[in-house]
Each structure stands twice: as C-alpha cells, then as structure tokens.
Swiss-Prot record:
Family from the record: Belongs to the dicarboxylate/amino acid:cation symporter (DAACS) (TC 2.A.23) family.
Domain of life of the source: Bacteria
Main location: membrane
Function: Responsible for the transport of dicarboxylates such as succinate, fumarate, and malate from the periplasm across the membrane.
Listed name of the protein: C4-dicarboxylate transport protein
One GO process term, biological-process aspect: L-aspartate transmembrane transport
Molecular functions per Gene Ontology: fumarate transmembrane transporter activity; malate:proton symporter activity; succinate transmembrane transporter activity
C-alpha cells in the first residue's frame, strides 16, 4: 500500500509542490532560480499537444459513420460554451459587487506605474474579433504545428478527418498509420508525465521565491474572493450541471486529481490537455466528441478566466474610485462576452484580454492594471483549475446531448467498479 502511494503521480506531485513552497519561502533567491524546471516541463507538454490533437481529431472524425454528427457536436458544444461562460461572467460580476474587495483603497491612477502594463496594453490593441478569427486560419500547415496554435491545428485536423472519411476504404491505410502514430504519441506523454513532479516543484518554488507571501497579504481580499468564487462555481454551477447529466462532480474531480495537481503546480491548463483527451475517452466519451470539445474549449470555454475578467475589471474600478453604474457594467459584460472567447489564443492570456476589455469600455484607467499585475500569477492557479474542470464537464455533457456517451462506462469508472473488477479477477 505504501509503495503504491509513493509511486502514484498524485502523491509525487503533491509532495513536490509542498517542497517547492518551502524552498521558495525560506530560500527565495534559490527558489527563483528553479524557474527553468517548470518552464522545461511546460515546453515538453506543448511540444506534444499539436500531434495529440491532430491524431485524436482525425481518427475520431474519420471513424464516424455520419458527418452530420460532427456538425451537430460542434454546434452543441458552442451553445454550451456560450451559456456556461456567460453564467461565469455574471457570477464574477455579482460576487465582486457584493464583496467589494477594492473599496476603500482610494488609489490615484496617476500614481500607478503605467509602464509596467504598457506591453500588455499594446498587445491588447492588436486583438479583435476579426483578427482572432483570421488567426484561426494558418498561413501554412507546418506553421500551425510549429507555433503550436491549438485552433489552427484543430481546423486542419477537422478538414483532414473529413477528407479521410470521404476516401472510405481507400483511406484505411492512412487511418491505421495515424492511429498507430497516436499510440506512440501517448507513449511519449507517459514518459513526460514522469517528470511532472520536477516541473511542479520548479514552477512553485519560482512563484513563491519571486513574488513572496507578502504580495498575497497586500491584495489578499481579491485573491480570497476570487478563489472562493471559483470553488462556488465548480461546486454549485458545474455540480448542478453534472447532477443533471447523471454524474457526481466530486467523483469526477477525484478522477482527474492527478491532472489538477499538475495544473496547480504549473499554473497552465495546457499541461494537462494530452492526458485529459485520453482520460475523457476512457470515461465513456466518444473520441470524436473529445477531440472537438476539449481543444475548442481551451479558447471558448474558459470559465475560470471569465470569472477573473469581470472581478478584476470591477476591482480596478473600486480601487481607483471609478464609479460604474448598471449601464457601465452591462457594457463590460457584453464586451467580455466577445473578448473572453480569444483568451487562450493570445500571449499572456487573461491579462491581455483584460487590458483589451478595459480599453474597449473606456471608462476605466488602463494604468489600473498595475494593481493586479503582481498578484496575477497567484490567481492563475484558480483560473487554470476551474478551466480544466469546466472543459471536462463540458465534454461529458456534450457527449450525452449528442448521444455519444457510454453512461455505464462513465458510472463504472467514476465509482471505481472497473478497478474493483480487475482486483477481484487477480485475487481469484
């Protein structure tokens, strides 16, 4: 029992995170130097994301009997994304207005260091709906894979899958090659995941060593408010959706606990993407659904980022005494409904989208972003964790709506009946 515990990735990553926190706190300079360990692990994961998405989507679509099912899955997924992310935006807006974490700070925007956020503001001006949609189309297929742009790879994979499906038996050889290649890729993922504890240790040691616990105390009310809101969203909103779909949210969280710990250590939901594709398929969701919903959700279903965007924007307004009436807040909500959909497709993710939104609304000082620049790194964990759980739940819901979910396999896996059956066979 003890040996299996020590060998489990869950225990190893958890231990690594704890050691990283201690090192960063007591030896901050040494902790800050551990950054390359976390960066290297995330780069290894990003290296494999494009081929994983390509193989999963192509084999999923090419193996389907009807192409109408693919279109139906995509439409249902986008509808779900829009509804749930809107709920997340509204919840963030309501909570920040009730708690008012920025009230009483009385910060003069003129005293803030605008240079600190100048890079983000400049990048935000380059972002727009048209630019985002145009960016989905790659200049070249090789460029899409080289840059690791998820949506570009997804677009090419969908087109490739459709074309391969139309070939019928003539394309069987290509299908078999891609399926075999997929098995090799997942073998590489298993090797990379053995390094997850080292990556989590390095990333956490750097975070604590670089920013220190003192940063948390200064703006702690916003951080606590945000974390509690994310927990409530997962338990209440996603929990209700899960219950209506026929599974328990806590059992699902237990099922993906290793992926959650990897995300917690690296602050990047992308680090768990390859394993999520595999795990959601083992949970009973058809490969074609998993291949479409998970990668698309990384740009269109960022629940944690949605909560962060509304809370951060209103917090800046409260801290700088920039009054926001109901009209301003509705305008903010409408702008975020559009701008939040490209959060994962831009460098700097949520922070740049926040800068773009504040610039578009025009009522808030862009320099106010400097207030949360220092604590943004600490809030990224909750964003990434909520995003991961949200995309997992979305996959199950969409799979059930389009009747591509094996509910018996879902319940057996979440209730550990499969592992219990294997144990019984071994003992007998």
């Amino acid at each position: 029992m003890k040996r299996s515990l020590f060998k489990s990735l869950y225990f190893q990553v958890l231990t690594a995170i704890a050691i990283g926190i201690l090192l960063g706190h007591f030896y901050p300079e040494l902790g800050a130097q551990m950054k390359p360990l976390g960066d290297a692990f995330v780069k290894l994961i990003k290296m494999i994301i494009a081929p994983v998405i390509f193989c999963t989507v192509v084999t999923g679509i090419a193996g389907m009997e009807s192409m109408k099912a693919v279109g139906r899955t995509g439409a249902v997924a986008l509808l779900y994304f829009e509804i749930v992310s809107t709920i997340a935006l509204i919840i963030g807006l309501v909570i920040v207005n009730l708690v008012q974490p920025g009230a009483g700070m009385n910060v003069d925007p003129a005293t803030l260091d605008a240079k600190a956020v100048a890079v983000y503001a400049e990048q935000a001006q380059q972002q727009g709906i048209v630019a985002f949609l145009m960016d989905v189309i790659p200049s070249s297929v090789i460029g899409a894979f080289a840059s690791g742009n998820i949506l570009q790879v997804l677009l090419f994979a969908v087109l490739f899958g459709f074309a391969l499906h139309r070939l019928g038996r003539n394309g069987q050889l290509i299908f078999n090659v891609i399926e075999s290649f997929s098995q090799v890729i997942f073998g590489i993922i298993n090797m990379i995941m053995r390094l997850a504890p080292i990556g989590a240790f390095g990333a956490m040691a750097f975070t604590i060593g670089k920013y220190g616990v003192g940063t948390l105390v200064q703006l702690g009310q916003l951080i606590v408010c945000f974390y509690i809101t994310c927990i409530l969203f997962v338990v209440v909103v996603l929990g209700s959706i899960a219950r209506a779909t026929g599974f328990n949210i806590f059992k699902f969280i237990r099922y993906i606990r290793e992926e959650l710990l990897i995300v917690l250590g690296t602050s990047s939901s992308e680090s768990a993407l390859p394993r999520m594709l595999d795990k959601m398929e083992k949970l009973g969701c058809r490969k074609s659904v998993v291949g479409l919903v998970i990668p698309t959700g990384y740009s269109f279903n960022l629940d944690g980022t949605s909560i962060y965007l509304t809370m951060a924007a209103v917090f800046i307004a409260q801290a700088t005494n920039s009054h926001m009436d109901i009209f301003h807040q509705i305008t903010l909500l409408v702008v975020l409904l559009l701008s939040s959909k490209g959060a994962a497709g831009v460098t700097g993710s949520g922070f740049i989208v926040l800068a773009a939104t504040i610039s578009a609304v025009g009522h808030l000082p862009v320099a106010g972003l400097a207030l949360i620049l220092g604590i943004d790194r600490f809030m990224s964990e909750a964003r990434a964790l909520t995003n991961l759980v949200g995309n997992g739940v979305a996959t199950i819901v969409v799979a059930k709506w389009v009747k591509e979910l094996d509910e018996k396999q879902l319940n057996d896996t979440l209730n550990n009946k499969n592992s219990a059956a294997k144990t019984q066979q071994i003992s007998s």
